[in-house]
Design a protein with these regions (language model features):
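Active-site anion-handling motifs in enzyme catalytic cores
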Residues: 1-421
Length: 421
């Protein structure tokens, strides 16, 4: 069996890299004889990291390019998309493999695959509306050419526009198997497709299966002594598009200011070492820059000299090992939160989408969670003060809860057998 893992993006998005790593591990565990290929924006990196065949993403998005280049890219993309769609309707799978059709190179890897597994995780929602159409097109094209399509645990929704909801309903109804990673996504998807559908199953984000490096190695990377009390912070630049609520804090300037004030106060009151953990680095085709945000927060602090920023891109295993060294982590990125809680570290989350809040709720940590539009240093300090004396209890609680979720992920993989037949 040939398995294509697609929508893998870049290793410089550490969450995306963790999804690829653990998708490979889960699929190899269940289908050891299968050939696995990864489709990613930077395929060479995944080839080197995991020893798998890797190919370029079918959509080479023109991120951060001038507008005229983006327009040209869009015209070309629409041309090959239409051509491949028509060809897939005129020819069956075997004939497509042998017939010369325009732009066949674009679908060569889809024709190779018996099973195509998306690890995009959060592309089917209107907060990332620039991607949703291309992702839904890919799922529909896979079905049209006769490949079986599976969406690995993902956030589905929110849908802010009627057209996107209707399009998602139409396309997702043809996907062979959909895993959601939170209860809200499960409810939304079943609402789209109907409550009785057997193609939708709820489980947890597969990054919870991530392995981690040991404590000594992690402390060496951080540059910290074993007896130091570390508090980790993961920050990001958020667009504040269609805010759930408007407050004095629902903007990026306020987010940076409040995070800097929080870090300064924690150093003054608790004598902790603050370590900033970016999870998106502006290399290897990654368009997000959490490193820049971390440096900006540090520059706004009065105690910035006491802050360490992890400036070199780590692997998911290294990041998780470093997060495990913290007494408490304050996270914004989804996968920083998942890797932190997965490492058993007591975690306070700032939720930029409901998926983060849902993850915290599923672990019994909702009281330590706030939406990004409302995040402020006073709330964060009060929450930190509640968690600090109870942190060892929460660490033990997390270890039990994560083990249960890991068992649930492994059990949910049984549904693949009905598709990968």
């Amino acid at each position: 069996m040939n398995i294509l893992i697609f929508e893998a993006y870049s290793d410089a998005n550490i969450g995306a890299c963790a999804l690829v790593e653990n998708a490979i591990a889960l699929l190899r565990r269940r289908y050891p004889a299968a050939a696995i290929r990864v489709m990613a924006r930077e395929p060479g990196v995944f080839r080197n990291l995991y020893g798998v065949d890797a190919v370029p993403d079918v959509f080479e998005y023109p991120f951060l390019q001038p507008r005229w280049r983006q327009v040209i890219w869009l015209v070309r993309a629409l041309l090959w998309m239409a051509s491949c769609w028509i060809a897939a309707g005129l020819h069956d799978r075997d004939r497509l493999r042998t017939t010369r059709v325009p732009f066949r190179s674009k679908i060569e890897d889809f024709l190779w695959a018996d099973l195509a597994v998306s690890v995009g995780a959060e592309r089917i929602n209107d907060k990332f509306f620039k991607n949703i159409v291309f992702s839904l097109y890919t799922y529909a094209l896979l079905r049209r050419i006769g490949a079986r399509c599976v969406i690995f645990p993902a956030t589905i929704g929110p849908f802010l526009f009627g057209w996107s909801r209707r399009l998602a309903r139409r396309v997702l109804s043809g996907v062979d198997l959909i895993y959601t990673r939170d209860e809200a996504s499960l409810e939304i998807t079943r609402g789209l497709l109907g409550p009785g559908t057997g193609t939708v199953h709820g489980t947890s984000d597969i990054a919870l299966m991530q392995e981690q490096i040991g404590r000594d190695e992690a402390l060496t990377i951080i540059g910290a002594a074993g007896e130091e009390s570390i508090v980790g912070i993961s920050a990001m630049r958020w667009s504040y598009f269609r805010n759930r609520i408007e407050t004095p804090y629902s903007n990026f300037e306020a987010y940076v200011r409040e995070m800097a004030l929080l870090a300064d106060t924690l150093i003054d009151e608790y004598g902790v070492r603050i370590v900033m953990y970016p999870t998106n680095y502006p290399v290897h085709g990654c368009r997000e820059d959490d490193l820049g945000v971390s440096l900006e927060i540090r520059s706004r602090m009065s105690r910035g000299k006491d802050v360490t920023v992890i400036e070199e891109l780590p692997t998911p295993a290294r990041l998780k090992g470093m997060l495990a060294c913290s007494q408490i982590n304050v996270t914004t990125r989804m996968h920083a939160c998942i890797l932190s809680t997965g490492a058993g570290a007591p975690t306070i989350s700032v939720n930029y989408l409901f998926k983060v809040r849902e993850h915290m709720r599923s672990l019994g940590l909702e009281e330590f969670s706030i939406d990004i539009e409302e995040f402020n240093s006073q709330w964060a300090l009060e929450t930190f003060r509640r968690m600090w004396p109870e942190r060892e209890r929460w660490r033990a609680h997390l270890e039990r809860a994560v083990e249960e979720k890991q068992r649930g992920i492994l059990d949910a993989m049984k549904y693949l057998d009905g598709v990968a037949r």
